[in-house]
UniProtKB/Swiss-Prot annotation:
General function of this protein: Catalyzes the reductive methylation of 2'-deoxyuridine-5'-monophosphate (dUMP) to 2'-deoxythymidine-5'-monophosphate (dTMP) while utilizing 5,10-methylenetetrahydrofolate (mTHF) as the methyl donor, and NADPH and FADH(2) as the reductant.
Residues the entry annotates as binding FAD: S50, R74, H75, R76, N163, A164, R165, N169
Positions occupied by motif ThyX motif: 74-84
Signal sequence range: none
Pfam families, per the entry: Thy1
Record-annotated membrane-spanning stretches: none
Location of the active site: R174 (involved in ionization of n3 of dump, leading to its activation)
Protein name: Flavin-dependent thymidylate synthase
InterPro entries: Thymidylate_synthase_ThyX (IPR003669), Thymidylate_synthase_ThyX_sf (IPR036098)
Needed co-factor(s): FAD
Sequence positions that bind dUMP: E71, L72, S73, R74, S84, S85, R86, K147, R174
The protein's annotated pathway: Pyrimidine metabolism; dTTP biosynthesis
Molecular function in Gene Ontology: flavin adenine dinucleotide binding; NADPH binding; thymidylate synthase (FAD) activity; thymidylate synthase activity
Length: 208
């Protein structure tokens, strides 16, 4: 999985929004320590979390499984643009069979699938991938129908935009050891992709 922060709102946008409430612009230090502390104090300590919604982050996420994508989409205050399965399935039409299930073919399948820490689950995912390949290349099934046979482990690619308040909620829930392991990895990757000067707003959200 690869996560890149493509764009983000400067911190001073949030601090200026907060200062609008009290008309305290003269105390601003133009995004310096005073303003950073103000955002944390008002948004995190005093729990006026709506002020954090002025901060927005735009991520590119590569290699997330379709199963994890479903869980990510449950975080409603966010925008997703996902690689179409029509174009995804074009990639599979011309590849060779993934059988037999040997080391070479399992390694080839990793281009398309997210593997987990269970050999049998991974083998079943590759068999599902092979069935999908057969539908496309040997039976000429249209992509719109063939996608119903896509395994949940199939990798996807998306643009993901979310505000700081919603991102805090996501990191809090998905960094827990009760969350799906792939979602734990995603939460860590999203945090790591944030600009360093923004990470202090989210450090308390991480469960481990």
């Amino acid at each position: 999985m690869e996560v890149i922060c493509k764009h983000y709102t400067p911190l001073d946008i949030a601090s200026q929004a907060i200062r609008t409430c009290w008309q305290s612009f003269e105390y601003s230090d133009d995004g310096g320590c005073k303003d950073r502390d103000l955002i944390h104090r008002v948004g995190n300590i005093f729990r006026h979390s709506s002020t954090l919604e002025h901060l927005y982050y735009n991520f590119e996420i590569k290699g997330l499984s379709r199963g994890a994508l479903q869980e990510l989409s449950r975080h409603r205050i966010a925008s997703l643009s996902v690689k179409s399965s029509r174009y995804t399935l074009r990639e599979l039409k011309e590849v060779e069979s993934f059988l037999p299930l040997n080391e070479t073919n399992l390694e080839r399948a990793k281009e398309f699938l997210v593997f987990v820490d269970d050999e049998k689950v991974n083998e079943m995912s590759v068999l599902a991938l092979e069935n999908l390949r057969v539908l496309l290349s040997e039976h000429n099934i249209k992509n719109d129908l063939a996608k119903y046979a896509m395994p949940e482990s199939y990798k996807t690619h998306l643009a993901y935009s979310i505000n700081a308040r919603s991102l805090q909620n996501l990191l809090t829930l998905r960094s827990s050891n009760k969350a799906l392991k792939e979602m734990q990895d995603l939460a860590k990757a999203l945090f790591d992709a944030l600009p360093y000067e923004h990470q202090y707003l989210f450090e308390d959200c991480l469960k481990h």
